[in-house]
Amino acid sequence: MATGRIQFAVSTPCNTKGKPSGYRLFEFKNDRLALVPSERGCTKVDVNANIQAFCYLRPNGRDTSISPDATHILDSCDYMVLAKSNGFIEIISNYQYKIKNGLRLAPSYILRCTPEDFESNFFSDYMIAGLEYSQGLLYCCMCSGRIYVFVMNLPTDYIQYKNMYNPMFPDCFFKVHHDNNTTHSSEEEKLFEGSTRYTGRSCSKHICYFLLPIEPSHLRSSPVVSSFCNMYQGLPIYRPSMYLHIERGISTFHINPLDRFCFMTVSPRSPLFIRKIILPLTYVTFLSTFISLKNSIQGDTCGEILSWDNVAQQNGFGSLFSWISNKFTFDTDIINSTIWDDIVKYSGTGMLDSGIVWKQRQGHAKDDIYELFHTQDMLGSSRRNSSFSTASSEPRPLSRRRRESFQALTRDAFRERMDVPCSTKWELDSFIRGLRRNTFMVDFEIVEKISHRNGNDGVNEDDNTTDESDETMTSFLTDNYKKMDIVCIDHFVTLSAFRPRYYDEPIIKIDSLSNKNGSENGTNEEEWAESQMKVDGQVIDDETAQFKQALGNLCSFKKLFMLDDSLCFILDTHGVLLINRFEIKNTKNLLRNSKDTIRIIPHDFGLINDTIVIINDIDVGTDNVCALTFHLVVTSMAGEITVLKGEFFKNCRLGRIKLCDSLKLNRKDRFVDKLALIDYDGLNAQKRRLDYDEKDLYTFIVKKVKRD
């Protein structure tokens, strides 16, 4: 049975200097992958700049339609947001309408990430860790730790489309309840909420209505911006509403679904953080004053005021900020504060701080890494081996011992015992803490625990009867956080789950160190497998052996998708893993769990860049056992875009997957990188045929890849 239409975008960076990068649109239908012809905007802006992140916005539960020029209340058009390595963010409105009608996909609005990052060189590239939208705030988080926040003028039902489509279990992700959010909001946040409510649509009240354009004099004086502003054909370039700077090396970023002023970050050698933006009254007062001033001056007049300093001078003030400061002279504390000085210095961008409200406890848990180094046999072997060499028993500097230990740590070290010569307990524990900090997270998802679950969720006490007076609980993590779980995967094939409301350590952790080698008690495992064979026959034994082999081949987790609050869909370079985390009874030996708890599909994906998951069908039985059918869209370092169809069956540890279609780049100076899901019709979508001219396909230069 053919699947519904899947439409997605793929970024195509170019590694040749002086040539443009960009992105392409593809459609998968009737088991065929085809290029969607589209006309892009000016390609000069893509020279020496590539797309780092997509963010596709559309109303939730409503059909999209083109926005008319006349004034109307509700916005129904969709927006594609493209964040580029040169620090510019393009917003394309009426995106699907333009695709269907063959219109140019030129940006309608331009954002600029400023202050610029000049730490590495003058024309520094922006490495983006995350581009996300939630409840009117667009976050752009750089790997350098710089976070730019833009206040968008959108209705409350607008959401960001994720790279997963799963209509079967929509209740495992937090819904936005504005009443609950304002209950625990500060006075500054309530004032911010009242000042930035959706205004309706007109020719002037667009998506960037709350943003301040960069002054033309600043555009001319900035060498980075001035080289691009002419290419955007006179479009206003808007500056961020807020800016903050955290530690460097951010690898993953997500907005807290319970609080739009709160976000979560992960970086190598650092734990998982939940941070809260500190919103000062000075900045909120400035923003609300500017918006009210804009309402009175601009009104419903078409066109954007490009220079507010010129308007201020026409009204007898030296600049916009002297005009605004004149409106709240009754409060001299605002004008005399350092926050106001920063607002003036950075031309209307608030330089804000953030506070850590929760932090993962890292480096002290007695997990499999701890047990690996603290077994008596290993320590005894170390003492015996030290007697064969007088040099090994001589005192040596601590730094040398640690250096040699780290150099000896290879992938084979996880499969055999290691020699730690003459290490005392505190030295060994210090080494283990350093090792564990290197097993950093590569991806994490936030889900809401469904209360009717009966499985093992990692919490012994009832959530409703927990003593709220516990001094160890963070006051910020209110009752709304009782059902929040953060599920994580790290580079060394480990799955962890946190419940920040109660713990700073994982409530469940599946470590590959013991499972790759089978179990700590090999004899018991063989006896157990033999008993299973006697009961169920030889077929089950073969499946168990194949399952063990496939599990041992896993080497690097890449992507995590939560199908519901328990089902973890993990993509590894050597297969697909489906874990029902609430049903796991034995984390030390995965074979001792039921067949439907942990399932795997062996497949060699190669070096994965990005993935889209489409869940076609889920059949859940009364015992919470499910059969699953899905489609995968994968981009790889080999320059391929691959679409595969996979299945997981009931009462079977092994699934199967097959190649549907694949396209590969012929050009050696380009590769395929980021993906963005745009549309999916579903299995009962109306069938229609799209014809493409060969001249449209020539612009991408692709070839079919045939496989057995």
Swiss-Prot record:
Regions of biased composition (Low complexity) lie at 381-396
> What is known about its subunit structure?
Interacts with core components of the GID/CTLH ubiquitin ligase complex. GID12 binds both the substrate receptor GID4 and the tip of GID5 in the scaffolding module, sealing GID4 onto the scaffold.
Q: What does this protein do?
A: Regulator of the GID E3 ligase complex. Modulates both assembly of the substrate receptor GID4 into the GID E3 ligase complex and its activity toward its substrates. GID12-binding remodels the N-degron binding pocket in the GID(SR4) complex, and could limit substrate accessibility of a bulky substrate to a ubiquitynation active site, thereby stabilizing gluconeogenic enzyme substrates. Involved in actin patch formation.
Sequence segments annotated as region (Disordered): 381-403
Q: Where is the signal peptide?
A: none
Q: What happens when the gene is disrupted?
A: Causes a decrease in the number of actin patches and concomitant accumulation of upstream components like coat patches.
**What domain of life does the UniProt record list for this protein's source?**
Eukaryota
Miscellaneous comment text of the record? Present with 339 molecules/cell in log phase SD medium.
- In Swiss-Prot or TrEMBL terms, this protein is called GID complex associated protein 12
Q: Name one GO biological process term.
A: regulation of protein-containing complex assembly
